[in-house]
Each structure stands twice: as structure tokens, then as C-alpha cells.
Amino acid sequence: MSVGVMSCKSTSRLHSYTDNSFTKASYKTVIQLIDEAKTYLGITYKAGGTDYRGLDCSGLVFIAFKKINISLPRKSIDMSKSGRIISFNDVRKGDLLFFKTNNKLEINHVGLVTDVDDDIKFIHTSNQLGVIISSTKEAYYAKTLVQVNRIID
């Protein structure tokens, strides 16, 4: 199944984030982050969007983290330089998954991990379906996943 993920190219830059440190927070904060992101389920895709009128992938992650008082860059490529890179085998709720979609040479898509069991699920924005939850077992995401970052430790 193809869900049509476009390269979330935002037109706005709200932060110039260069620090690669990660934020200390509790499990409760991670749950608040995921719950906030889930309030946008079903919202339509809009390039550069950061509210209920429409979101792109990095806009969704940006506003969810902002709600728990963590500032991230606005673009997925810049977000990929935040926190610390971890092994896919160490992924947990609240981590960020980064993808190179549409045969792009650089990271152009991001999702937030919502569940980790036998399957890793993440919330993100599809240009055709809006904000959805997908699985890393889906062939498209399995082949385009390139990096996992931990922001909250």
C-alpha cells in the first residue's frame, strides 16, 4: 500500500538549533508528547503547516514537542541533528524516526514513535492521508528508514 509521503519541505524556520544535547524528562512526559501528537490524527497534509488547518511531518513533530516545552528545529533534516542517534534495536516511545523518501539523497521525512512491541508504530503525516499511525514493518517505511534519534532520555 502506498500512502504517498512527500518530502516535508517547510517554508518556515522558527529556530536555529545547533546544540546536539538531549533533554532529560520522565516517562510521563513521553506519554504527554505522544498524546499531544495523537490529537492531530486525521488532520490533512499541508506543506509548512503547524496547526489543525494542516500539517506536514516536521510540523507535527515540532508542535508536539513544543507543547511539552522542548524546542526542535522546524525541518526534518535539521531535526535529524538533534538529540542523539541511537540503534534501531534500542528504539522506544518518544524517539524520532527519520526517512529518505521518494529517492531523495537527504532526510526528508520524520515520524514520532508511539508504540514498541513486536512492531514499531509511529505517527507522521502522509500527503494523501494526513496525520496517521504507520508501522516500520510496512515495506515502504522499512526500506526508507535511515536514522533513529532520542530527544527525551
Task: Explain the meaning of each model-derived region.
Residues 22-25, 70-130:
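...with weaker cross-activation on analogous glycine-rich loops/strands in unrelated enzymes
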Residues 3-26:
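Bacterial Sec signal peptide processing site at the extreme N-terminus
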Residues 137, 141-152:
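Short, low-complexity, Pro/Ser/Thr/Gly-rich segments in the mature regions of secreted, periplasmic
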Residues 129-139:
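Catalytic alpha/beta core of large soluble enzyme barrels
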Residues 38, 42-46, 65-66, 70, ...:
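Sec-exported extracytoplasmic/periplasmic mature domains
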Residues 31, 35-39, 59-66, 92, ...:
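Solvent-exposed, polar/charged alpha-helical surfaces in well-ordered, non-transmembrane soluble domains
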Residues 25-29, 49-57, 83-89, 105, ...:
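Extracytoplasmic/periplasmic, Sec-exported soluble proteins
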Residues 15, 23-58:
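Post-signal-peptide N-terminal segment of Sec-exported extracytoplasmic proteins
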